[in-house]
Each structure stands twice: as C-alpha cells, then as structure tokens.
A protein has these predicted regions:
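C-terminal basic regulatory modules in eukaryotic proteins
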Residues: 287-317
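Short, flexible helix-coil linker/hinge segments at the edges of structured domains or between repeats
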Residues: 92-110, 155-178
Length: 317
C-alpha cells in the first residue's frame, strides 16, 4: 500500500510539472530603452497632428548597432530557454517598413477627418507582443576587467504599465564580449524576473487585459450619448454592454459628456470563445456591431490608437 501511495504522489508531481511546462506564456519583444536610443542618437521626429515629438528610431538602431543586436539576441536566448515565445524587433521593423505611407493615414470616408498612428504604436500593434522588454546598459572597464550595468524593465504592451524589473551590475570579468557580460550580470535576477512576468500574465488570463476605449461623436451626427432608447440613454446602453462583455464586469468610466466617453481599465478577455487571440480592435468592433444593429442602427468608425487603445466615432464611417 505504501508503495502504491508513493507511486501516486510521484505521478501527481509529474502531471503538475507537465501542466506547468504547458502553461500559457506571454509573447515578448525586446527593445532598447528610450534613454539608450537618445544617448546613441537613434531618434526620429514624429508629427503628432501638429506637435513634433522625438521618438526612438528602432529601424536605424537595429540597422546600425551591432551591440544592440547582440544584446537583443542574448536576452531572446535567455527567455526562449525559459519557454517564452518571442517576437524579433528587427523582423517586425522590416515588415512595417514595407507598409505604404498612405496606410499610415486613416480618414473618415464622409468628413475626411484624419487620425495618424505613430511608428511606435504601429510596431506594437503589428508585433502583437504581450510584454515589451525594455533594456538599457552601460559597459564598465576597470583595469583588465569589464562588467555591465543594466536595467531591464517589462512593460505591458497594452497598458504600458511596468509589470517587472531587474537591475544591477555584474562582477568584473576578463571577457570583453558584451553578451557574456550581460548573461553574467542578469543570471542572479532572471528567475525572479521571469516569475513576475508569469504572475502578471496569469492575472491577465484570470482578470482580462486592461485597455482603453475612447468614444466620440462626429459633428454631423444626429445622435449623441444622451439620446434615449427604450428609456435608457445611449451611454447607459454602452455601460450595460461593457458590463456584460468585460471580464468580471470590470471597467471604469473616467469621463463622459453628451459627445464623448472615456472608458479606462476595460478588462477584455485574452481569447475569444473560438480560442482566437482577442485584441482591443476586435473587442471594439464587437461593440460597434452591437451599436450598428437594431434598434440603434448607429454607424461607427473604429480606429486603432495603439495596441491597448481604440477610438470609436459614432455617426458616420
């Protein structure tokens, strides 16, 4: 009996280990930090509807810096060894470069109103990584020995909130190879870092992904958010739909007037009922289809504003 009992315990432990190994893991993409890009002059000007902003130029960085590519490759290897799927920055930058300039401008078919999307938002939307690993580093040299000081941050690609971090300085080494110095520096902190990544993703699986829905009314529209349908104002109708479709009914109505509503901390499922991955645009399109059907019959233009934010404009397309 005791022998059978021990066999049962071993079997359960093996099943737990297999289940852990097969647990869903977040998709990662490694990028250089904004500070690193600025220090090494990898920046570009972006015209954000009349306001010039300086943003990282990842295309120039991965095309020019061998050090950056070596660092990204090493982190990719370290994370892949721990079972995390990865999106490669260089390949995603290339795919975005192949998109035509005309596709970067979205216009209303009726009014001609336009909204632009920044290269960084487009990169995140195209790559569809769950978490961005933001890396900055400095090589220190003392006599014949070198070490590396690093700062690795994990950012939720949808909410841009930091979910994990690791920083420190490695021990002095006679090796001059950057990937070796990086691996020596991060090895003591990597397991705890990975645990925090997985804990965040497990929370997303349980409580949904956090996104933002920005709702507006076209100037030419005959409808606003105070128009009533069967005794309920349109904004109440939308509130009820979100409550029915958000994970655990969780969302926050941050601001609202008769012509705009801002929903933050909208918790959407990671996966659709058919098992396909769910994103902000897909969730927003479900809401748009609901509003476009009877009894509302409201045309809705749905526009991506980055991976974790969507703009819905009611009244025309």
């Amino acid at each position: 009996m005791k022998y059978k009992y021990l066999l049962s315990i071993v079997f359960l432990m093996m099943c737990s280990a297999i289940a852990y190994g097969q647990a869903k893991k977040p998709t990662l993409m490694v990028v250089p930090s904004d500070a690193w890009c600025k220090e090494h002059h990898f920046e570009q000007a972006f015209d954000n509807q009349g306001t010039t902003e300086m943003i990282p130029d990842y295309k120039a960085a991965v095309s020019t810096s061998k050090e950056l590519n070596a660092v990204i490759s090493k982190i990719n290897i370290l994370m892949a060894d721990r079972g995390f799927p990865l999106k490669d920055l260089q390949q995603n930058v290339k795919s975005i470069s192949n998109l035509s300039a005309e596709d970067r401008l979205i216009r209303s078919k009726t009014s001609g109103a336009s909204i632009t999307e920044s290269p960084l938002d487009r990169l995140r939307r195209t790559a569809k990584a769950d978490i961005i690993l933001d890396i900055d580093w400095t090589v220190n040299t003392v006599g014949p020995k070198s070490s590396i000081t690093y700062n690795l941050r994990a950012l939720d690609a949808y909410s841009n909130k930091q979910v994990a971090g690791a920083e420190g300085t490695g021990k002095g080494s006679f090796s001059a190879e950057l990937p070796v110095l990086l691996e020596e520096a991060v090895q003591d902190h990597m397991d705890a870092f990975v645990e925090r990544l997985q804990a965040h993703f497990d929370d997303l699986l349980t409580n949904g992904r956090e996104v933002v829905l920005d709702m507006r009314i076209f100037d030419t529209s005959a409808v606003d958010f105070e128009k009533e349908y069967n005794g309920f104002e349109l904004n109440e109708v939308i509130d009820n739909w979100l409550s029915d479709n958000c994970v655990n009914h969780r969302f926050s109505k941050s601001d609202a007037t008769e012509t705009m509503i801002l929903y933050e901390q909208v918790r959407i499922p990671l996966y659709k009922t058919n098992g396909m991955a769910q994103d902000t645009y897909g969730f927003a399109r479900e809401l748009a289809r609901f509003l476009g059907a009877a009894p509302y019959n409201i045309p809705v233009k749905t526009i991506n504003r980055g991976l974790g934010r969507c703009l819905l404009i009611l009244g025309e397309k």
